């Protein structure tokens, strides 16, 4: 029985049996895709949040970056929505806008099947910052890991979370928490949903937390650049779905957090403390209390995003590798693009070397590798710029 992908609204149909990605005896044949051009339907918006719980897969956020609606691909399996991807096409390159979620190979193959069947001039599909259920053996593709997103699966209760923490972590949290309350008995932690706070208060809180973050990083010899446009986007999302954690002493803010609710997940956008209280590990305490607040709200998971910090693993967050993925129309089309293959390979080796350098002490070999990385980076950047101009 032929499976169809397409939309009755746009008349886009493609027989899956004519596309080389599908085999009659596997799960791919049971996935029916729908392409809706130049719009994101309401049920797709809900599906993005329900399926992925990621800020960078959420249309409410993506439209702040680019208000022009992209194309939407929606996948169904046995009448259940199993995938939603937003994408744009430019000069034969399909760029997927949906990011920071786990991409299953079957969903990737179904998407490639439908897109390559519908858009005959499309040569490649590019995903940025997606987790992959490796290995990808079905597709003609290249991929490499370049970052990570720390994700914490949340239990049903704060008590269960406390019991799951390591003995040393529980001791640290209890010890510093008791010391903070002993030295500052007026300390109070509470959470507020954004709907209970005026906009000007939300804005003041975000700016104060950013200043705490900047001061803390400066104290460690690092620089933080705060982008005004990104802050505006953050404030708009905070007003829509934010939860603030507030720590105060005698009514003055000394620590806090901002998490955004996407589907049944939270994304921790800010968590910072006044560096004057660094002796109490107040930053760690604030993150822990914020995670407890997410549990109280019934969240399924919390994204702590990128950045390798020990406290994330102390609080049981697990790193999920983020990949850049390029899918080619076929292995033959892939072989016809040697420069593109070389560029992806060079960028992949560059990231592997960077990961190695992070785990090794400075050495002569390290300096040599850094020099090679500089060459690889220039090569990749030059080719990417040329390909964008075509």
Tell where the protein language model's regions lie, with residue ranges.
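A conserved beta-strand-loop-helix scaffold within acyl/acetyltransferase catalytic domains
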Residues: 2, 6-82, 87-93, 134-149, ...
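Active-site/acyl-donor-binding loops of N-acyltransferases
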Residues: 2-26, 136-164, 297, 301-365, ...
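Hydrophobic beta-strand segments of well-ordered beta-sheets in folded domains
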Residues: 16-20, 96-100, 117-129
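Short, high-confidence coil segments that cap the C-terminus of an alpha-helix
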Residues: 68-70, 120-124, 242, 296-299
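N-terminal accessory interaction module
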Residues: 77-79, 94-105, 109-118
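Non-catalytic accessory segments adjacent to catalytic cores
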Residues: 107-156
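Aromatic (often tryptophan-rich) hydrophobic motifs at membrane interfaces
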Residues: 110-116, 224-337
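PEST-like intrinsically disordered, low-complexity C-terminal regions enriched in Ser/Thr/Pro
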Residues: 366-379
């Amino acid at each position: 029985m032929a499976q169809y992908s397409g939309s009755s609204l746009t008349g886009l149909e493609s027989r899956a049996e004519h596309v080389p990605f599908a085999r009659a005896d596997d799960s791919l044949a049971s996935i029916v895709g729908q392409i809706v051009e130049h719009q994101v339907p309401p049920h797709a918006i809900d599906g993005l949040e329900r399926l992925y719980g990621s800020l960078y897969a959420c249309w409410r956020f993506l439209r702040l970056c680019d208000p022009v609606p992209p194309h939407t691909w929606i996948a169904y399996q046995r009448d259940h929505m199993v995938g939603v991807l937003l994408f744009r096409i430019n000069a034969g390159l399909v760029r997927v806008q949906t990011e920071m979620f786990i991409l299953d190979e079957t969903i990737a193959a179904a998407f490639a099947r439908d897109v390559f069947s519908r858009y005959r001039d499309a040569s490649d599909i590019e995903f940025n910052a997606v987790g992959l259920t490796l290995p990808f053996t079905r597709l003609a593709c290249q991929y490499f890991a370049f970052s990570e997103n720390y994700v914490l699966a949340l239990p049903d209760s704060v008590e269960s979370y406390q019991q799951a923490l390591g003995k040393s972590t529980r001791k640290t949290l209890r010890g510093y928490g008791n010391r903070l309350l002993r030295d500052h008995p007026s300390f109070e932690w509470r959470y507020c949903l954004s709907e209970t706070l005026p906009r000007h208060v939300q804005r003041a809180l975000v700016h104060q937390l950013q200043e705490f973050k900047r001061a803390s990083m400066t104290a460690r010899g690092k620089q933080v650049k705060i982008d005004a446009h990104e802050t505006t986007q953050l404030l708009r999302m905070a007003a829509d779905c934010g939860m603030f954690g507030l720590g105060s002493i005698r009514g003055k803010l000394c620590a806090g957090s901002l998490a955004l609710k996407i589907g049944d997940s939270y994304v921790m956008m800010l968590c910072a403390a006044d560096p004057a209280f660094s002796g109490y590990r107040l930053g760690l305490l604030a993150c822990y209390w914020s995670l407890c607040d997410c549990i109280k709200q019934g969240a399924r998971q919390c994204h702590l995003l990128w950045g390798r910090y020990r406290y994330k693993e102390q609080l049981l967050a697990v790193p999920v590798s983020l990949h850049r993925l390029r899918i080619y129309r076929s292995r033959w089309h892939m072989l016809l693009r040697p420069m593109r293959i070389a560029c992806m390979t060079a960028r992949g080796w560059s990231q592997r070397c960077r990961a190695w350098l992070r785990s090794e002490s400075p050495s002569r070999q390290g300096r040599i590798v850094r020099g090679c990385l500089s060459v690889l980076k220039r090569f990749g950047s030059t080719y990417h710029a040329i390909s964008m101009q075509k």
